[in-house]
């Protein structure tokens, strides 16, 4: 790794306080996202009584969300490389709040689709959060720090879906209002507490190529050692997005679960993820390299995903969640490998 990738003295380096700030911000962010997962398919179902149409429209809702995130992620990353991480993160928190309130007030499927486009674009600031962590962390500690960030994701999934399931039992739209309030809280937290991580001397100008998703992929592919990881990253992203997109529909139709039961199942997913990434990951990395951990994690996740598809009873889902401990480290391991190949001014694009 080049010297440019090292955190700048006096502005970067190991900054535990800044790490705590971004961890809280990410926790609130994913708590808000987790709130809506158990109830979003049912909200789509309010606009159509046909189960086949509900599934199709939910697929479009998920697709537009993911497409917006794909397009927006490099744009937000490039903007954060130019103007700093903090303003881009604040923009994302504001956009998420508007998205949640718009979804809660949607009166048609088209309004729901439009609000999810905004949500997908703003949720892309998760990439900026990763860049923030890279800015404030020495290279040798990044895998562990990315694991802590993943633990915040897990805790958000511990609390969010359970709260969403319980609130959804009162009213399907209530979780969206609560999620919007949390996003506003995150915005206020960021305005008054969150420090900037990228000093002015390490920023660079924004170019159209940097904001182009395909150009960003090509730039990543040119980084030493990352080109071979690109197919792996694509497959992992596709698998994870597909799993969480169909989770509620799958368990509802196969096991007859409602919002509360789905909330508890996602609670289990988040608990295991937080335990592994927040407590066990540092110990695991003392035994194996990030490269070897990535291979082990991918194998574990592959077996688990096949198991979900073959499960015939609801309790089997919980057993598979418990067995897939290593699978929860795949994101931190791969992100560490990619981040280690990028210079300090390119972290927003990783």
Model feature map: region roles:
Residues 39-55, 245-261:
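Short amphipathic helix-loop junctions that connect adjacent transmembrane helices
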Residues 66-74, 124, 157-158, 270-278, ...:
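Residue-level signature of mid-helix packing/kink "hotspots" within the transmembrane helices
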Residues 70-109:
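Conserved MFS/SLC helix-loop-helix module at the cytosolic interface between two early adjacent transmembrane helices
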Residues 72-84, 276-290:
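Helix-to-loop junctions at the C-terminal end of transmembrane segments
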Residues 114-154:
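Cytoplasmic helix-loop-helix junction between adjacent transmembrane helices
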Residues 152-192:
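Helix-loop-helix hairpin linking two adjacent transmembrane segments in secondary transporters
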Residues 291-334:
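C-terminal transmembrane helical hairpin of 12-TM major facilitator-type secondary transporters
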């Amino acid at each position: 790794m080049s010297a440019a990738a090292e955190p700048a003295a006096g502005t970067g380096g190991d900054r535990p306080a800044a790490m705590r700030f971004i961890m809280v911000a990410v926790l609130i962010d994913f708590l808000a996202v987790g709130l809506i997962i158990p109830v979003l398919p049912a909200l789509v179902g309010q606009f159509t009584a046909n189960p086949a149409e509900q599934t199709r429209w939910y697929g479009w809702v998920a697709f537009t969300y993911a497409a917006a995130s794909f397009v927006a992620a490099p744009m937000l990353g490039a903007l954060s490389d130019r103007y700093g991480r903090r303003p881009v993160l604040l923009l994302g928190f504001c956009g998420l709040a508007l998205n949640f309130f718009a979804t809660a007030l949607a009166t048609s499927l088209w309004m729901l689709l439009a609000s999810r486009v905004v949500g997908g674009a703003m949720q892309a600031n998760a990439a900026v959060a990763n860049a923030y962590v890279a800015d404030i962390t020495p290279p040798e500690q990044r895998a562990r720090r990315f694991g802590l960030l993943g633990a915040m994701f897990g805790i958000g999934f511990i609390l969010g879906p359970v709260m969403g399931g319980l609130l959804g039992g009162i009213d399907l739209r209530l979780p969206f209002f609560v999620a919007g309030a949390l996003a506003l809280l995150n915005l206020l937290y960021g305005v008054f507490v969150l420090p900037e991580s990228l000093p002015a001397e390490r920023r660079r100008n924004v170019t159209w190529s940097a904001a182009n998703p395909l150009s960003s992929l090509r730039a990543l592919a040119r980084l030493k050692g990352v080109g071979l990881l690109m197919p792996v990253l694509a497959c992992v992203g596709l698998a994870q997005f597909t799993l969480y997109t169909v989770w509620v529909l799958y368990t509802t139709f196969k096991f007859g679960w409602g919002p509360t039961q789905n909330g508890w199942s996602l609670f289990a997913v988040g608990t295991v993820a937080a335990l592994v990434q927040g407590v066990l990951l540092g110990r695991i990395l003392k035994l194996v390299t990030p490269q070897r951990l990535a291979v082990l994690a991918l194998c574990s996740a592959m077996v688990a995903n096949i198991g979900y598809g073959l499960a015939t009873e609801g309790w089997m889902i919980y057993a598979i969640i418990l067995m897939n401990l290593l699978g929860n480290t795949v994101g931190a391991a791969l992100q560490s490998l990619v981040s280690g190949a990028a210079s300090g001014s390119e972290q927003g694009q990783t």
